[in-house]
Design a protein with these regions (language model features):
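Membrane-proximal periplasmic segments of bacterial cell-envelope enzymes
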Residues: 1-280, 286-307, 340, 347-348
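Solvent-exposed, polar/charged alpha-helical surfaces in well-ordered, non-transmembrane soluble domains
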Residues: 90-101, 211, 215, 219, ...
Length: 686
């Protein structure tokens, strides 16, 4: 009995002790989860999470029909991660030296943000955008320089050698390393330090790395390395290189501008072409995410604090299939001419939609491919024909006789002549002490006889336009040229030259030049000092064909969200100018251009044109043995849809330009298989 009582007391004691332990456990659990739960959870998150920038996708570019021109391709990036870097300098240096050896053995060039040259004699190199600002900030943070004494226009007070020496000491670099070896190591250490200084977690040092390299870097084999993802631009066409443009890291000279807009120092932006022009549309908005990791450092979950927003889809006015045709036609023409006379030459073509100003094609020869830009850079950059030069918008050329319709409109609209007025042309026009000759007189001593303005345009009679040009006056001719957009900005969103219309003020502003009244005569036929771009010529003809309504030339058609679900913006600017032209005056000029292709000097080339067209030839004197060839046209004649201009440097007055124009018209109005035109002998035309 006593044993039973003793057992009961023991059991009761054990039960009481167990209850006490259980109660203590629940009190502790209540305190941890309820009373201090939020606090402990926050501590846990801080200890096992990190914040990362989520780089979003740049918007894509399409043509007018929705055909992709520039897209994005996802790639793996090699990043230095400040959170994975060992705190011990020796350990970190050892890991980075192993990484350098691996990258060099694999032939991988990594991005080095330290603005010092790679080898002795060391010098500062601030060619990378933001590098000067970043170094100044770092020097101030280390108290190696006074902030007030630093600018982005001058080198820091430390010499390059002194900076390298201080960095070796700061990062505890092994003294046995050569300066060249140390330079590589401190470059990566500096990158980590600046990344941390800017309160960022990672910095990409190589892009588009291979899966094989990733396999070697996995499982923390190289402590500070993180494999990230980003996107690179993928070009779906070899055409339109001058128009599309490239993306690069922010140019040094524009860093302050982009900084104010919230760009990161390592952001990629449009460098030229529409990539630059439409940067605000194409730019996405990066996101932020909180990444949870386990004790081994592996990601176990993620929470987005700011969702990334991809850039918009920008539709251009270009028809890329047509653009490819125009570039091919232009190249074939030039290469055929060069094969015959062994003269190297450039060329350009511009095609504009009548009634809208939409640019359907801008072609420049020679050109280049954005797909192989880096591989071909040295060859293209040293090519004397300058493939990177966009002749269609930045090449300026004397218009030659393609300017004569402007002179005709100016004379008609001011009452100097009427559509029925005739002039007896005599081959040589005497003005003061000068004698100005018609091209026909120079050729065989002939004249065009008595003609009206329509016939004068058809046969391109210089004598006729000398006379009406003198009577109309240079100020009136220049005023109408400006109204047609010649010597004025076209409105195009990419860089262009404005060109110049001959005027007394302009000529007198040139050193060693002065105005003479005789220059009115040469300006009236498109010579003298007048210089215009192919795009200006095409848009002028579009204005003429459209009855005098001039629209700004433009490449933007519309902007939609990345998935094209919503319309963001659309080009809808009103006409830039409306020229009041009497219908009978307009008809007299347009009929002359039509007669040229029906029964004039280019009729041979237009007999296989699939559409009724009108045109004007031009020969632009350059002072050399061979003049530039200029040709403008529009079609269809009765309901104009497109206008074009073709310029071939040293192209002379041959029929190659007319043939080129016919091929371009056929390419637009028919399928590619039908886009053929007669290629005859290089007949003399004016």
């Amino acid at each position: 009995m006593d044993d039973k009582k003793q057992f009961s007391r023991r059991l009761l004691a054990i039960g009481a002790l167990f209850s006490l332990v259980l109660a203590a456990y629940f009190v502790t659990l209540f305190d941890a989860q309820i009373v201090h739960g939020a606090e402990y959870r926050a501590r846990s998150i801080r200890a096992n999470t990190k914040s990362e920038t989520v780089v979003t996708s740049r918007g894509i570019l399409t043509d007018r029909n929705g055909k992709a021109l520039v897209t994005n391709r996802s790639v793996y990036t090699l990043e230095l991660d400040t959170s994975l870097a060992p705190s011990d300098d020796a350990a970190l240096n050892k890991e980075l030296l192993r990484l350098i050896e691996l990258l060099e053995n694999r032939g991988i060039v990594w991005e080095d943000t330290l603005p010092l040259t790679a080898g002795a004699p060391f010098a500062y190199d601030f060619s990378v955008s933001g590098s000067h600002t970043a170094l100044n900030s770092y020097l101030v943070s280390k108290k190696w320089a006074d902030e007030d004494a630093l600018t982005t226009d001058t080198d820091p007070p430390l010499s390059p050698e002194a900076l390298l020496s201080r960095l070796r000491t700061e990062f505890k670099v092994d003294g046995e390393l050569t300066d060249a070896e140390a330079r590589k190591l401190v470059g990566l250490r500096y990158c980590l330090a600046v990344t941390k200084l800017n309160q960022l977690s990672t910095a990409a040092i190589a892009s588009d790395i291979s899966v094989e390299l990733i396999a070697e870097l996995k499982d923390g084999a190289y402590a500070p390395i993180h494999i990230g993802t980003s996107s690179v631009r993928e070009y779906q066409t070899d055409a339109a290189a001058h128009i599309l443009g490239r993306v690069t890291k922010i140019p040094r000279e524009r860093w302050n501008e982009y900084k104010e807009k919230g760009y990161a120092m390592n952001a990629y932006v449009g460098y030229d072409g529409v990539e630059l022009a439409f940067e605000d549309y194409l730019r996405g908005r990066n996101g932020r995410r909180i990444v949870e990791t386990n004790t081994a450092g592996k990601v176990t979950g993620e929470i987005y604090s700011v969702e990334p927003e991809p850039g918009n889809t920008v539709a251009l006015t270009l028809d890329i299939d047509f653009q490819e045709d125009v570039e091919r036609i232009l190249a074939e023409t030039v290469e055929s001419m060069t094969a015959e006379d062994d003269i190297d030459r450039g060329a350009a073509a511009a095609v504009v939609q009548v009634g809208t100003g939409e640019v359907l094609s801008l072609a420049s020869y020679p050109t280049f491919s954005l797909k192989t830009f880096n591989e071909d850079y040295t060859e293209n950059n040293t090519d004397p024909l300058q493939p990177f030069w966009n002749r269609a918008t930045q090449g300026t050329y004397a218009p030659g006789s393609t300017f004569k319709p402007v002179t005709a409109i100016a004379a008609l609209e001011t009452g100097i002549i009427t559509p029925k007025s005739t002039i007896l042309t005599k081959g040589v026009y005497h003005y003061g002490d000068w004698a100005y000759k018609c091209w026909l007189y120079n050729q065989n001593g002939g004249t065009h006889g008595r003609i009206d303005v329509t016939e004068a345009i058809k046969v391109s009679c210089n004598y006729f336009f000398y006379d009406i040009g003198r009577r109309t006056g240079i100020s009136t001719i220049a005023r109408y040229a400006s109204a047609f957009g010649l010597g004025e900005p076209t409105g195009i969103e990419i860089p262009e030259k404005i060109g110049v219309m001959t005027t007394p003020d302009y000529v007198n502003s040139l050193d060693g030049h002065y105005w003479t009244d005789g220059q009115t005569l040469t300006a009236a036929i498109g010579q003298s000092y007048s210089l215009f771009t192919p795009l200006q010529l095409a848009n002028y003809v579009a204005t003429l064909a459209g009855g005098g309504t001039r629209y700004n030339a433009h490449l933007l058609k519309e902007v939609r969200t990345y998935d094209s679900a919503e319309l963001v913006d659309v080009y809808d600017k009103p006409p830039a100018e409306i020229i009041d032209i009497e219908p009978e005056n307009l008809q007299a000029v347009l009929q002359g251009m039509r007669d040229l292709v029906v029964s004039g000097s280019v009729a041979y080339y237009f007999k296989d044109c699939v559409v009724d067209a009108a045109a004007k030839t031009g020969t632009a004197q350059t002072g050399g043995k061979v003049s530039n060839g200029v040709f403008v046209a529009f079609a269809p004649y009765d309901d104009p849809q497109i206008a074009l201009a073709v310029v071939i440097e040293k192209g002379g007055s041959g029929g190659a330009l007319a043939s080129t124009a016919v091929q371009i018209l056929n390419a637009y109005f028919t399928s590619v298989d039908e886009a053929k035109a007669v290629v005859g002998e290089n007949m003399l035309i004016q």
